[in-house]
Amino acid sequence: MNAINISNLKKSYDGKTNAINNISLNIPKGEIFGFLGPNGSGKTTTVRILNGILSSTSGHAEILGKTVGENNLELHRVCGVMTESSSCYENLTAEGNLIFFGRMHGMEEKLLRQRIDFILKRLELLDVRNKKVEAFSTGMRKRVSLAIALIHNPQILFLDEPTSGLDPENALNVLKLIKELAEENEVTIFLCTHQLKYAEDICTLYGFINNGKVLGFGTFDELAAKKNVSLQLKIRGENISEKFGLIHEGNNLYSKSISGDAEVNAIIHNIVANGGKVYEVVQQKLSLEQLYFMYIKGTASGVTL
């Protein structure tokens, strides 16, 4: 079963212009999905529909097999949400916020206390659990907001610009925590951001959206293959046969166009199995930013498609 299924989803606020236009996505369980696009592209509208905050104009969406819009209370039990504007109750402590939201989710008191201890420790907030949020830095408030989204142990986590307002170090720390928590608890993450560098660090699956339309969907390698992007494998070694399709560039350097990561292991294995020596391997590939602009603008690094 996929975690999220979206079919021909459309939303118009004025009956004329579509904020999102026939979006279709199928996201398997356990993926960290990066929904990437510029401001106003339709990312937040999509998340709000999936969370039941907005109704769609047409189309269908399911979360863990449950139809979005039919029983939003049930969906809220399995989903956690952290948006760009997520805020805590400043007059409450970090722990007080978690108690409040945990009880809202109907958590049993003993389980709630255990969960609070776990999350505060995991997010490095134990030392400030009894301090009011009003005294916290932006980075600490983001961690409290993430803790609130995770308090009821959701199976799906929606994150809309979770690093907004953070300096690079704090942004990286928050995303590292998100990735670790997702892997530890097998949580499916739906991450909306225009911070491509951060998305590249943690995402396993991508969707590119612009002007309400999904322009590309898949893993990095799948998206690159659809644009006929050829990755280059560079190998420095000795006694390497050219029968494996490698071009000898001189000075013990060899190269080969490859389709993705899966091909690299087989090439290295065959070289070594046939008596070759491998000293260094480098895979030269596009950055996520370059690939993104191939879909959004049709160019990357000055190369016109």
PLM features per residue range, with description:
Residues 99, 103, 110-128:
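Conserved ABC ATPase "signature" region
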